[in-house]
């Protein structure tokens, strides 16, 4: 991912009320660090590593779960061999202890404080991450995607005159933010204050809020710190101590940054350029983008590339797709034109055979009239009466004897 090329090599310095006429509507050169490649992979990795360095070691008590004189009852008692609490007269007596599967027992693999809490990160990688985060602050799309309200901001990157560093009161700081169109983002952070979910609210982390603008100043000991530090969501940082945790909170690129003129002019000397190494960071040169122009279609269709590209090859030979004529009728019809006629004749013969069979069955199934049905029923009843009269079972007292005699 490459930051979009700067449309102008100059950035306008936004003047404030009360500035001298010489300080208003001036311009500064855009430093090369603002056009460096944006590497979210490096930023995410470095942020995840250095954020571990502020962790406080924790562990469970070494005595937890073992503050009882439990002993195993051994075998032959029809219970498990887990250690059990001695004594009697209480529910606790006889209960299992010590094991991680027991109520009141220790946890599995109790945590220790000698865990490797901190992470070491290569110096060059940390510098690349900060450079990428700085470059992302100049891309309005990334800043808006992060959720900052910059609709009323006149220009990105946003640079204000050095008179902002002399602001002492918070009311004056709010006035400055309103003049440059950045107060909407600070207001968003203020309105987002809420109570933290979970147990963190009991541990001095009760309130959470969104991030507002980051004010970067260039004068050591400037009064601007006291003016802006009490605004919710607004953070401050000296240009020589830029921190990735502030430039890309959560590892997410696109923090809304307000630069003072003096801080913006120092970026070139602190981070150097693509050809000239940094004056403050020994031997550091800005990373170059793999593609100077990210518009690949424009590069391919340019006259320089098209003049040396080989023409499109025509008449390429492709393998013939062979189909089985025994399974594919269209292929069979191409190979044997008579197959279509033979297929039709077989279908007609089958249809005529089915029709003849149906007619034959209908002819055999003679329709019986109502009178004939009544005559058949009467004949059946007469035959039944004859069978009863001809039998001599009434002469036997026991019907089963008649059955035996008849057999």
UniProtKB/Swiss-Prot annotation:
Q: Does the keyword Transcription regulation apply?
A: no
- Please give the Gene3D superfamilies that the UniProt record associates with this protein: 3.40.1370.10
Q: Specify the domain of life of the species encoding this protein.
A: Eukaryota
By its UniProt entry, which InterPro entries does this protein fall under?
A: Ribos_uL4_C_dom, Ribosomal_uL4, Ribosomal_uL4_dom_sf, Ribosomal_uL4_euk/arc_CS, Ribosomal_uL4_euk/arch
State if Amino-acid biosynthesis is listed as a keyword.
no
Keywords associated with the record: Ribonucleoprotein, Ribosomal protein
Give one Pfam family, short name only: Ribosomal_L4
Report any one BP term from Gene Ontology: translation
Q: Where is the signal peptide?
A: none
Ranges for the region named Disordered are 57-96
* An example molecular function term from Gene Ontology annotations: structural constituent of ribosome
Kindly list the GO CC terms recorded for this protein. cytosolic large ribosomal subunit; cytosolic ribosome; nucleolus; plant-type vacuole; plasma membrane; plasmodesma; vacuole
Q: Which family does it belong to?
A: Belongs to the universal ribosomal protein uL4 family.
Know the name of this protein? Large ribosomal subunit protein uL4y
Species this chain originates from: Arabidopsis thaliana (Mouse-ear cress)
Which gene is this protein's source? RPL4D
């Amino acid at each position: 991912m490459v930051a979009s090329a700067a449309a102008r090599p100059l950035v306008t310095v936004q003047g404030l009320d009360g500035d001298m006429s010489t300080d208003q509507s001036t311009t500064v050169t855009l430093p090369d660090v603002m056009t460096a490649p944006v590497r979210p992979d490096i930023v995410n990795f470095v942020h995840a590593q250095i954020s571990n360095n502020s962790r406080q070691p924790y562990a469970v008590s070494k005595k937890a779960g073992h503050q009882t004189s439990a002993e195993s009852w051994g075998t032959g008692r029809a219970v498990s061999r887990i250690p059990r609490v001695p004594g009697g007269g209480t529910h606790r007596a006889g209960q299992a202890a010590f094991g991680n599967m027991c109520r009141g027992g220790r946890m599995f693999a109790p945590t220790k404080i000698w865990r490797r809490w901190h992470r070491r990160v290569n110096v060059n990688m940390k510098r690349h991450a900060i450079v990428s985060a700085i470059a992302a602050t100049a891309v309005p799309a990334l800043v808006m995607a992060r959720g900052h309200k910059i609709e009323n901001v006149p220009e990105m990157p946003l640079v204000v005159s050095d008179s902002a560093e002399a602001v002492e009161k918070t009311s004056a700081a709010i006035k400055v933010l309103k003049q440059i169109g950045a107060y909407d983002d600070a207001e968003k952070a203020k309105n987002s204050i809420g109570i933290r979910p979970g147990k963190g609210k009991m541990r001095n982390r009760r309130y959470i809020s969104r991030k507002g603008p980051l004010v970067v100043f260039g004068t050591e000991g400037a009064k601007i710190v006291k003016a802006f530090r009490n605004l919710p969501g607004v953070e401050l940082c000296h240009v020589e101590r830029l921190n990735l945790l502030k430039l890309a909170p959560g590892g997410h690129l696109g923090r809304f940054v307000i630069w003072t003129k003096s801080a913006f002019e120092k970026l070139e000397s602190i981070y150097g350029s693509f050809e000239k190494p940094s004056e403050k960071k020994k031997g550091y040169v800005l990373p170059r983008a793999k593609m100077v122009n990210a518009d690949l279609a424009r590069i391919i269709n340019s006259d320089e590339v098209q003049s040396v590209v080989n023409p499109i090859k025509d008449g390429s030979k492709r393998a013939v797709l062979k189909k089985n004529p025994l399974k594919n009728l269209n292929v069979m019809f191409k190979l044997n034109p008579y197959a279509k006629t033979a297929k039709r004749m077989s279908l007609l013969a089958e249809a005529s055979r089915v029709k003849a069979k149906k007619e034959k069955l209908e002819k055999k199934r003679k329709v019986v009239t109502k009178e004939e049905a009544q005559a058949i029923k009467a004949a059946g009843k007469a035959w039944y009466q004859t069978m009863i009269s001809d039998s001599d079972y009434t002469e036997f007292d026991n019907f089963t004897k008649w059955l035996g005699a008849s057999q």
